[in-house]
């Protein structure tokens, strides 16, 4: 990669492009007892042409996606739905394919529907290597969420960014209200995270630093709510380089 072709990109974007970092919030479809049962039940459902929306599939998806929506990363959700990454449109294979089933909140599932295709598959693609997640400004000011492509402009990246923007800002009067609630939850999450970062940097007590480090590690792991925003907050600031050690290598 020739850096002169990417002048103006933040330091993290350049480091990703040059292979210095391997960041990914990549959800692994682990083989567990729950997923084995879900796959077996999906096979039966396919043969009987019955519903894929069954207990074992819901429980397995909840486990795989750490109980959070794969699109907005919100965990404070009361309504979840099974989402098809590639809209099945009646296609039996896509409809019952375990690898095509994702865990989504009702808000994001309704917004996505079959309007965004193709999009990145977070169980296969290093989403954070392709998209930067940033929150600019503060509440009461010109607060704005930014999703920007890192490196190659691909159709699935562009569509994913469009979906993220729609999910976080809403597309109808009702969805805009729901999106506002998601952004409020994100804001509170990031505020708490920033406080941990500040305390970690300021404390001189070794034991206290270890305790806060544990909290930071918890907030940056794959299962954390809004992990993408938190990781990019660290990656974008040189002063936080010490905290990068708590970001898991996937």
Per-segment meaning from a language model:
Residues 113-200:
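Domain-level detector of nuclease and nuclease-like folds
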Residues 50, 71-103, 112-131:
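Histidine-centered nuclease catalytic patch
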Residues 108:
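DNA major-groove recognition helix of helix-turn-helix/homeodomain DNA-binding modules
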Residues 32, 87, 136:
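Residues that form or immediately flank small-molecule/cofactor binding pockets and catalytic motifs
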Residues 22, 160-250:
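C-terminal, charged low-complexity interaction regions
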Residues 3-9, 14, 127:
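Short hydrophobic targeting helices and cationic amphipathic motifs
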Residues 16-68, 90-96, 179, 191-198:
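Short, charged surface segments at domain edges that flank catalytic/cofactor-binding sites
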């Amino acid at each position: 990669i020739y850096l002169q072709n990417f002048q103006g990109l933040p330091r993290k974007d350049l480091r990703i492009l040059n292979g210095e970092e391997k960041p990914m919030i990549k959800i692994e479809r682990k083989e567990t007892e729950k997923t084995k049962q879900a796959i077996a039940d999906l096979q039966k459902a396919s043969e009987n042409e019955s519903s894929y929306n069954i207990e074992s599939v819901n429980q397995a998806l909840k486990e795989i996606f750490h109980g959070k929506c794969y699109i907005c990363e919100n965990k404070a959700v009361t309504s979840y739905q099974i989402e098809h990454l590639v809209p099945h449109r009646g296609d039996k294979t896509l409809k019952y394919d375990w690898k095509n089933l994702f865990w989504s909140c009702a808000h994001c599932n309704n917004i996505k529907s079959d309007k965004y295709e193709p999009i990145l598959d977070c169980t296969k693609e290093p989403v954070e290597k392709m998209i930067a997640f940033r929150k600019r400004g503060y509440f009461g000011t010109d607060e704005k969420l930014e999703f920007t492509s890192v490196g190659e402009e691909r159709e699935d990246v562009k569509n994913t960014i469009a979906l993220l923007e729609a999910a976080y800002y809403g597309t109808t009067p009702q969805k805009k209200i729901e999106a506002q609630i998601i952004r409020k939850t994100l804001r509170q999450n990031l505020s708490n995270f920033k406080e941990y970062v500040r305390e970690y940097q300021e404390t001189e007590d070794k034991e206290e630093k270890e305790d806060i480090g544990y909290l930071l590690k918890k907030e940056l792991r794959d299962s954390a709510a809004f992990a993408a925003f938190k990781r990019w907050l660290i990656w974008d600031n040189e002063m936080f380089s010490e905290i990068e050690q708590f970001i898991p290598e996937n």
